Amino acid sequence: MSVYDVVIVGSGASGGAVAYTLCKAGYKVAVLEKGRLINREEFSKDELAYSRRDLVTPNLFDEYHTIEEKIEGEWVTTPTYESGWSFWNGNIVGGSSNLMSGMLHRLHPDDFRLKSKYGEIKGANVVDWPISYDDMEPYYALTEELVGISGKVDKHPFEPPRSTADFTQPPTKENAVVKLFDKSCKALDITPLVTPRAVLSRNKPGRDACYYSNLCGSYGCSSGAKGSSREALLKPALSTGNLTLLSNTYVKYLHSDNKDEVNHAVVVDTVTGKEKEIKGKIFVVAAQAHESARLLLNSASEHHPDGLGNSSGEVGKNLIFSGGGSGQGELHKETLKHIKFKELMTTGLFVNRSILDWYFIDHWWDGTFKGGSVEFMFEHQNIISRARKNGYEEGKLVWGKDLGERLVSRFTEQKSIRFEVFNDWLPNDDCFVSLDPTHKDKFGMPVGKLRLEGHPQDVKVGNYIAKKCEEVLEEMGAKNIYSSVSSSPPQNLVAGGCRFGNDPKTSVLNKYCRSHDVKNLFVADASFMPTGGSVAYTWTIYANAFRVADHIVKQLQKS
């Protein structure tokens, strides 16, 4: 049986970054991915496949989670095959990085020291990170170049410092609506920023620039422009000859022969059903935060009775999501100002605008507290989801001629512009993942049970920013403006569960994301994050995984 230098569980952003670095350094790497390989040319823009079918995620009757929510003061557990609330995100080679919208920001230096900046927050388990922004910055820059992030550096008081003057990839093409948006923001004394995006505006070797298909977020990319782990990292890693990519490989648990070392992974071929062992010198878990914690808990043994690497009892604890919410307004043909309606209706081009003005809030009336960021975009262009929004009016079903007229109007006489608010989801004692005592997946392993409870501050911040965004849409002349902020978590933005820190009693990982308990075990996905910042996690996930990979190279060189 082959013994790999490094075995990586998961092929998403973090798994790809570690694999790329190790393969380029000459080490033999195995990547274990539960899902199948979908090649670039197979990514279609099929609305049915992506909105109504299980194309890139497991069927919920085969693999699922159970969700604990507080209802009328009582914790109620529901399996997701009943609720339809899926916490799977892109179970294919490259993971959910294949399907992201790619709107990325770096964390701010103060995100690494939230407790020092704001002190204790009642009901929240906020801690400072064991590293600083300066430790991460070189890897943000590396991600920008290797993954391919397009953008433009705009001067802003909350823009993190950079080691490079600007992006090497200029911004992607923009819809004319940005003229109206920028003008409206300036009228309100708000600074509009060009959104950094993991989408190529120019060709890179082996990858073509964006062709503006109009179907980007939630869809795979058929040009290679999107900065997925599969395109940007795994394909170059495969070309080294050092990577063994094992798709359709479900990892049941990690086996340890002694207390401080993992020996092998026990896996199942999801096509044949055959079980086997994969041996390695170092193991890297990168299966997405809640699933990484579940894997460690399912890897309990006589040496690790409470779960692998869980002497602290912290595995699965302090799960975090992204706080905030969303909203939108409609730009109508008859009331549109400053731009032509034909320009607005041009398909494929991005809105490409962010606002960071409320990232840190220090106001004489509203007070001082951590805020968040905002991304602006057109509503999702999947025609099915857009059409379904018109099926009801005042709670009554619309059908026949009335429905047809509503659809024609929606698709030809207006365009909806959306915003998404990202703010910290404060870690707390009632947001965690554990093993469900009764439910098991089709492979016989206990499923993850997610208790989902937010902190009141999350909703307060989300509402504060959403109201500001509504003012922007109002200034743009939008109609039917609304926003929705709640403590319900977005299932595509999950972090925490194996937080890193200097104290083995209160954290799972050290500052290099190596287990405090197990010397050859690393966790490289978003699990490490003790706090999430107020932006989407992906750029930070990539950057930290490159940082961790560099440390693994040094560890292998020493041995």
In which residue ranges do the predicted regions lie?
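A glycine-rich dinucleotide-binding beta-alpha-beta segment and adjacent secondary-structure elements
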Residues: 194-198, 209-217, 252-255, 410-432, ...
